[in-house]
């Protein structure tokens, strides 16, 4: 409460902590861990509703990575026949979809923004759910446009060149502005 509420442009809500990546420039995986932990969906939605009552219409989902389970994560767990891990990942993914379904039911004047990895562009189901949930923008990490640069920052999972451009276009095609 340092400033009167009407001086704030937007509010923020954190829905998940931790990130399974280990990018060299990022402290999150060291400070918050590599195992994503989600807040309860109902608690998150209630916080958003409370913020709306206070007059906020733009909310940043201040997660370090709004897409903590990739399709590749699911595929690897399945191939390894790691049933426990596969169950955990599917549950985490289901919670993400549940959250987005509930956000989609909020009044249409609510708009959200988040941070996400490029891998989400490979998941049209997830991008569609984001669009329906009024997530209008995403900060997508593009730390380098070369393979060598990505390797240097431990982001070999990201893309470069035409592949990078194609993935960024996927976000746009689903109504999500990339920053």
Residue ranges and their predicted role:
Residues 1-178:
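Radical SAM [4Fe-4S] cluster-binding motif and immediate context
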